[in-house]
């Protein structure tokens, strides 16, 4: 039978790992630093920068207490070691206790120093100060980031301990102990590595993860790496102003929907075209409101009264990209081999059509 000390050590090790790197089950139970210190941290949506100033500091303090917690637990799990009486403990345990006390002491000193003068000494505040105008301070930059973070059009991905956020102006990486920030107009982005995982909890298909180096031309801003699923690469590029170079010649695998959209577009371009009457004025696509509608559904695959497809009488209201996305969204995600031959309803009138019925307006 295992001794209580061994059992406690294994249990505490599991607890410490789950506390530092909390899985979804631990997060849902509220056993994280963010949940335990929620009243002090405030709202991330209301004040993103201020929230992470406190979160990084609180996380450092909380994690620094773990060795001391283990020592106190061993006082009860192994009473024969006399850990409750420091002068009776062995030399090894005295050394462990010394470092277990020193770690939170140093962390507390750092936290106190960072919080002085309204968090002016925090590493994040110093990074933001680099981007501040001469007549303003880091708080003006923080206010800009807070405003952009509240917008719904930002790009955000990743687990809470390794999040990547891209706004109109900023590229942000959130880690356990710090926040990396770089201004889009000052950065160079390079794909440096890729890893492929054959099995993932959310999909039965291989998943590719890309590592992208974010380097600022400003020497006072430290470079950092972001990691994301290759399926999100296209969305990231749309949000970035700077191009992404591929120094490692990495073959980037697109998502299944992106691959289908390319095939859908190439097949539609081979269909017959449609000419609108001179009196008809085309309006913006109701899907994206950015591109002029350039698609008309006309039954071409079979005779008018044959087959599953139906004639659509809607005026042109969609662009090719949005129609392709609509077509893909109506498919069985587990059977992509059936996508090209399937029939879907018109997004407006519900008349069924296939790829052969999609005509580009010339």
Swiss-Prot record:
Superkingdom field: Eukaryota
Transmembrane annotation, as ranges: 58-78, 95-115
One Pfam family recorded for the sequence: Tmpp129
Signal peptide limits: 1-28
Residue intervals on the Cytoplasmic side: 79-94
GO cellular component: endoplasmic reticulum; membrane
Membrane topology note: Multi-pass membrane protein
Subcellular location: Membrane
Main location group: membrane
InterPro entries per the UniProt record, alphabetical: TM129 (IPR018801)
GO molecular function: ubiquitin protein ligase activity
Disulfide bridge partners, by residue number: none
Family statement drawn from the similarity comment of this UniProt entry: Belongs to the TMEM129 family.
Protein name: Transmembrane protein 129
Organism of provenance: Gallus gallus (Chicken)
